[in-house]
Amino acid sequence: MMIDIKNAASSIVDLVKTSVDYFKNLRSDDSGYKMKYDFSLPKKFLQINLDNMPFISSFLKVTELDKKLNISNNKDSNHLRGLVNIASTCYMNSIIQCFAHIKELYIYFKKDKTQKLMSEPYNQDKLFILFGELIISLWKIDDSSPLYPYIFKEKIGNMNPLFRGPIPNDAKDLLTFILMQLHEELNHPNNINNFNQMNNMSNCNMQMNKKAMFNSFVNDFQHNYRSIISELFFGLNYTETRCLCCNSALYNYQTFNFLIFPLAQVLNNKMQLGNVIDNTVTLDECFQYNQIYSPLNDYYCTVCRQNSQGKYATFLSVLPNIIIIILNRGEGLQYNVKIDFDENLDLKNYVEYFKEDSFYELIGVVSHYGQSGANGHFMARCKSPIDGFWYLYNDAIIQKLEYFTKENFLQGNPYILFYKKTKFG
């Protein structure tokens, strides 16, 4: 693909300079600063044809990347809004769009109680205010103009140096930062440190009955460590450590807000079993791999009180309402491992409790185009909670995909999957 880099770079520099200058002027006007995302972009910006402009992070265009997809225009989709790439922020835009398509987040931030919380003076330096305003602005009906998330980008850069400046980043890193930061801010102030206390409690009481430990952990969590983030994204798993000498087992419960599957290791395990046809692994194979025991060669058993051989594995105990799956490909040749997944996901064979409530449907996919997570280009495919159709978000460009097909969704490298319980919402 031939691109005039000089002209592309000139257009991008003009765009960024114009927009940054505009925001500097906007921020000096208190009345105009109240709504940080809903505004008319400068005339000079609107004159730039985004459909024909290469993107900052990778100089890749959606028409080239997805020319085989069955895509139609979104002229009738006035509830959709894109996000402008403001210097290698495709990683941020794709994550925000996936969050924005979770209707429970929108409902939470629109509630009077949350709006009051957002207006309190002592909360004005918190990330959840900018995040909530951005989510609400993305669903402004009858306004399909793209949003410019400069202030949100500036905020996360000030809070975490990893996201400072025009540097490409890994979407996974921003996802984990947002989840934990919002949970910490929206959790009750008196209970912020309870998570570490609970982990210490579970580690110190390994000899407790497994069921009793589960009940104790869940009760403490529900009473002391809840937020909208934990309600949506937190699940519970446990690590079983077993002595191969006396067969005693110790259990340690902990919360999780996403799962990471190392695709190269999953493929290697599949090869050892002789089940390899190509370099593709399925989500089922990822969950099966996650439950394989790993050896402990220098293990001290507190029951038989001696050094012995042991093994350990981690199992899912309670599933979250929205499960986030990160597909870690590694670098180099490992990056060529492919993933196969469906729109529906049944996890009843992999969870300890509430098996009847373990069915999920896909609502968002972050895909990556490049050879490592921190370079290349990120795009999001999201299912609209309004019309039920799928849309491709390539920064400011939105294109309709209509329905889920593997041909559409396995394009590029699917990297982060968002699944929602079918009985939830």
Which positions does each model-derived feature cover?
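Papain-like cysteine protease catalytic cores
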Residues: 45, 54-72, 101, 105-255, ...
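Active-site nucleophilic cysteine motif
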Residues: 83-98, 127, 166-177, 374-378, ...
